[in-house]
Amino acid sequence: MTDHALLLVNLGSPASTSVADVRRYLNQFLMDPYVIDLPWPVRRLLVSLVLIKRPEQSAHAYASIWWEEGSPLVVLTRRLQAAMAEHWPHGPVEIAMRYGQPALPDVLARLAAQGVRKVTLAPLYPQFADSTVTTVIEQAKQTVSEHQLPLQMRVLQPFYEHPAYIEALAASARPYLEQGYDHLLLSFHGLPERHLKKLFPKGVKHDLRAADCCHGATAEVSSVCYRGQCLATAKAFAQSMGIPDGKWSVSFQSRLGRDKWIEPYTETRLDELAKAGVKKLLVMCPAFVADCIETLEEIGMRGSEQFVEAGGQELVLVPCLNDHPEWVRVLADMCEKA
């Protein structure tokens, strides 16, 4: 074994579907200042209020999608790890979670103890956001610094419109598209608008409701505009598959709280599409590379029920990339070149 590890990092999951484990997980997740970017006292108060009822509700949702092997997100990420090990000859391939287990600091410490000296850190997020990519990088840096770990790190950058990534999306989705459909909805995880606005250069006024978002903007803006990157992913995918305009659209899911989030909202689009006469709706969730509660339960279960109740006939959830062979090949190549 050589001394260069590949570390795949995903969001995380509760240890089980118990209310106590879900509460512990939600507390860690929501108290991250990159997730809820409010002063600590306000964040603590808000999260404490959320934790009164949300853990029980979320525990029920997790139970509805939990596998015999455990959390789908963790199981699928481990499958990806096993597949990636066949493509990474430089050292061990490990996984870590930003929240929950296996914890990122623990994995970094273990790698250092094993004699690893170089780490390619791969946040498994195609698009950039502080609440996903930045928090992973900062926790890794903090761990290395505080514990004086002898690790050199390089980081896989967001790959939202990398041609090979788009090809992997196409390869995984093609069997579902070939079965026929009325409309394709690409549903990305949403974010509060303020998360994006605070990253824009001072003096830049950017319309987060514009149809083309930051298309044509400077790299300084487009590199931090999550909404624009999602739209770029969707457009590149639709073009690669030859899907005509009007037969696909983009939306944003998982809104939490009363703040203004980026639009359009997935829950709104599901009703609109059903009422517009769409009978068979395909939904892809390209912000996620592994299926999780947001895809399996929020879209595959609740979203499907909502769409049918609004007049649609069938909602088909296209699986995430998971451990699809083309995705494994593409990810290995991107990590090699990181």
UniProtKB/Swiss-Prot annotation:
It is found in: Cytoplasm. GO terms for molecular function: ferrochelatase activity; metal ion binding. Pathway: Porphyrin-containing compound metabolism; protoheme biosynthesis; protoheme from protoporphyrin-IX: step 1/1. The keyword Endoplasmic reticulum does not apply. InterPro entries: Ferrochelatase, Ferrochelatase_C, Ferrochelatase_N. The keyword Plastid does not apply. GO terms for cellular component: cytoplasm. Belongs to the ferrochelatase family. NCBIfam families: hemH. This is Ferrochelatase. It comes from Pseudomonas putida (strain ATCC 47054 / DSM 6125 / CFBP 8728 / NCIMB 11950 / KT2440). The lineage of its organism: Bacteria, Pseudomonadati, Pseudomonadota, Gammaproteobacteria, Pseudomonadales.
